[in-house]
Amino acid sequence: MKIALGIEYNGKNYFGWQRQEKVHSVQAELEKALSFVANEKIEVFCAGRTDSGVHGTGQVVHFETNAIRPEKAWAFGTNANLPDDIAVRWAKEVPDDFHARFSATARRYRYVLYCNKLRSAILPYGITHTHLDLDEHKMQEAGRFLLGENDFSSFRAAQCQSNTPWRNIHHLNVIRRGNFVIVDIKANAFVHHMVRNIVGSLMEVGCGNQPPEWIEWLLAQKNRKLAAPTAKAEGLYLVQVTYPEHFELPQMPLGPLFLADEL
């Protein structure tokens, strides 16, 4: 049988999602817990491999198993064997043609900035603190230049292994909630560090160092060296993965928990 899971995790203590030799990863912890519940070795496949320090509230994985368990056992049983910073949010049996990565039609991220002269002791790791006074309206205006299908070479990490820099951004919204500025971005897929590189450059616009039209110019240059530094990992969340409706996967609040679902 094939099972899909919705996964939430705090990426602070992990060297990214992907299982690797001699480093702590979310995938390795999840596979260990699932293998215990299934009483056999389990390998999971995810919708998106997040980097070191990046969080997830809407990660989706699938795995195949010979073990027959009710859906609630995959959720509650696995959670009982996971560390506190990883949790299963839902479990569902899926058809054989489902694949967490290749069946996905879109991914959605939220980047959370805490704008204050002084740092927070309550939320030190799930946000990116900045002393800059960001203008979310200018950031929103700049973001519209990135909508649609474009070559995102200017926002692509040098080590990116994707065959193409072309991606299609469905929406990019910048919202303020008190001292929090949230960049909410959805696309068919993302090149390596794309969200963090976009956020870093939007911050240059938000603080007044660059005009909104600078983002349009950057996009046209197709040169990563001209853009702003990459924003820190700690403020980034994978909040949603979209699939065709016929798979009937559960819909959960996007999160993170301290933000309203709809922004």
From Swiss-Prot:
GO biological process terms, semicolon-separated: tRNA pseudouridine synthesis
Gene3D superfamilies for this protein: Pseudouridine synthase I, catalytic domain, C-terminal subdomain, Pseudouridine synthase I, catalytic domain, N-terminal subdomain
Query: What is this protein called in UniProt?
Result: tRNA pseudouridine synthase A
Its taxonomic path starts at: Bacteria, Pseudomonadati, Pseudomonadota, Gammaproteobacteria, Pasteurellales
Q: Tell me which InterPro entries the record gives.
A: PsdUridine_synth_cat_dom_sf, PsdUridine_synth_TruA, PsdUridine_synth_TruA_a/b_dom, PsdUridine_synth_TruA_C, TruA/RsuA/RluB/E/F_N
Q: Which residues bind substrate?
A: 109
Q: Which reactions fall under this protein's catalytic activity?
A: uridine(38/39/40) in tRNA = pseudouridine(38/39/40) in tRNA
So what EC number does this one have?
A: 5.4.99.12
Gene behind the chain:
truA
By sequence similarity, the record places it as follows: Belongs to the tRNA pseudouridine synthase TruA family.
SUPFAM superfamilies assigned: Pseudouridine synthase
Positions of the catalytic residues? 51
NCBIfam families, per the entry: hisT_truA
Function as written in the Swiss-Prot or TrEMBL entry: Formation of pseudouridine at positions 38, 39 and 40 in the anticodon stem and loop of transfer RNAs.
An example of a GO molecular function for this protein is:
RNA binding
Q: Which domain of life is it from?
A: Bacteria
Disulfide-linked positions: none
Assembly notes = Homodimer.
Keywords on record: Isomerase, tRNA processing
- Organism in which the protein naturally occurs: Mannheimia succiniciproducens (strain KCTC 0769BP / MBEL55E)
